[in-house]
Amino acid sequence: PRATAAFVLRINEETGEPIFKYPMTEIGSQGFFTVKIEDSGAFAYKLITEGEQAAEFYDPYSFGYSVDPVNVMKVVNGDDGILSDFHVKDLFGARQITLDGVQGVSFCMNMPGATRVSVVGDFNGWDGRVNPMRRIDYTDMFELFIPGDLMNTRYKFEALYRDGNTDIFADPYAEVYEVAPGNASVLAKLEYSWLDS
């Protein structure tokens, strides 16, 4: 939303080297950009934005689900079979993962009654329009993979409800939180060497 220009950068899938830069056209004044690329088939790409929000990044929406939809459906349906081998942290909250060879963070949250859930944080100006999450079919669960190094950044979830109200809340599955009054969740890798046997 704070970009003044945007481009699709076609890259070599193996080396990541740039091949061609397609300019995008802004639609309206809300920072929504689009481009139609004719007859090129699927290709690897990054997005480039200029202006206040200048960046080069992989498109979060070009990746498949970062959580296993089968496990999501098992949780939704209350399948006891998943509980013997399942850890809540393996599905919900924020987890550092590698997806399609790209490192990033998987976000997943169950939000009954929400029409939109977004990840907001230091990395997107706390703007819920930047990283809206995808609803997993037939559930109230939302997920999104955000590529890149987000370690030591603060984040929360923003939910928009049918009545138009929004709520911003910390990740209940986070391991590290900002001190009050902010109370944001913090993406951090906890490493501790236990000394007992």
State what each model feature region is.
Residues A6-V8, Y45, V117-V119, Y155:
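Short beta-strand elements bearing conserved aromatic residues within extracellular beta-rich modules
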Residues P1-A5, S40, N110-V117:
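Short proline/glycine-enriched turn/loop motifs at strand-loop junctions of beta-rich domains
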Residues L9-E13, D122-N124, M133, P172-A174:
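Short Gly/aromatic-enriched secondary-structure transition segments
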